[in-house]
């Protein structure tokens, strides 16, 4: 994982105007509008210490209403099969998600694509409640091979602009995701 792309995602989720504008240059007008929603409801995004080890993910996105550990992957290939170290990272994310009631995410950036090149996937956990439980139903989980092993398929992920639209919607009656 290149820190350049990790930084790119960090700047978008943190609502840094220059970072958002850089990422949306080749997006459609609708995608740009959705991505800019993060400017009004940004996250505090920190790089996780020991990134990728013990289920921490690469980034931790925090806001008063939600929190996500995010594992960032960047490839030229549309599919990434998890094995070895990447499978260990996945298993650790599942464990920590279950243990702490979190919804870990994978963010996959496909190199060489115009428009929204990021896709978001959810790591399946069973301990989600409240607004995270509702949100989980809207975000696709990692697909499975015929043997049942999780893998990343860029085509099956949620575009980042749609993810931002969901988590950054403003409901005047509630500062949380209760409106989902």
Task: Label every model-predicted segment.
Residues 41-44, 72-79:
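Short, basic, glycine/proline-bearing loop/turn elements
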Residues 1-50:
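Acidic-basic catalytic patches of nuclease active cores, encompassing PD-(D/E)XK
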Residues 117-180:
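Intrinsically disordered, low-complexity terminal regions enriched in charged/polar residues
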Residues 55:
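Beta-rich catalytic cores
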Residues 75-99:
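Mg2+/Mn2+-dependent nuclease catalytic core
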Residues 13, 59-61, 65-76:
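Conserved catalytic cores of phosphodiester-cleaving nucleases, focusing on short active-site segments
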Residues 50, 73-75, 109:
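Histidine- and/or cysteine-centered catalytic micro-motif in compact active-site loops
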Residues 94-128:
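Nucleic-acid nuclease catalytic cores
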